[in-house]
Amino acid sequence: MRKVKPARKLGRTAAHRKATLSNLSTQLILHKRIETTEAKAKETRRVVEKIITKARKGTVHAQRIIFKDIRDKEAIKVLFEEIVAKIGTRNGGYTRVIKLAPRYGDAAKMAVIELVDYHEMPAEGQKPVKQDRSKRVKGSKKSEVAS
């Protein structure tokens, strides 16, 4: 009798799925925040949480085990020197998935996955500066009138 396994297939073969999650994990460690589909973000969260938990041990054995998943020396260096130092006292919950609006082209559910302690909020009272889009677009009526 077939039993359901608790992981998403992401519409890929096993090798392609493993490579995709490895690449997403590497980029999350290097950039601290990535935007992807909701399903990939949730699966990446599972992988990264386990990787960071292993990295907290700080042993050479842990580095070798993690290197099987990540395969990027720069990411391993950042993980063990920077991330573990900052997240060292936290007991799990190292990542956060924030849902976004659907993607324009195919309406896929999008999300941002980020490391929790690296989330940087803009300074209070400071609003983001909006660009005047009419100056940016070629041939717009506003830019012709202003000229």
Curated annotation (Swiss-Prot):
MF GO annotations: structural constituent of ribosome
InterPro entries: Ribosomal_bL17, Ribosomal_bL17_CS, Ribosomal_bL17_sf
Domain of life (superkingdom): Bacteria
GO biological process: translation
Gene3D superfamilies, A to Z: Ribosomal protein L17 (3.90.1030.10)
Sequence segments annotated as region (Disordered): 124-147
Family in the record: Belongs to the bacterial ribosomal protein bL17 family.
Subunit structure: Part of the 50S ribosomal subunit. Contacts protein L32.
Protein name: Large ribosomal subunit protein bL17
Species the sequence originates in: Chlorobium phaeobacteroides (strain DSM 266 / SMG 266 / 2430)
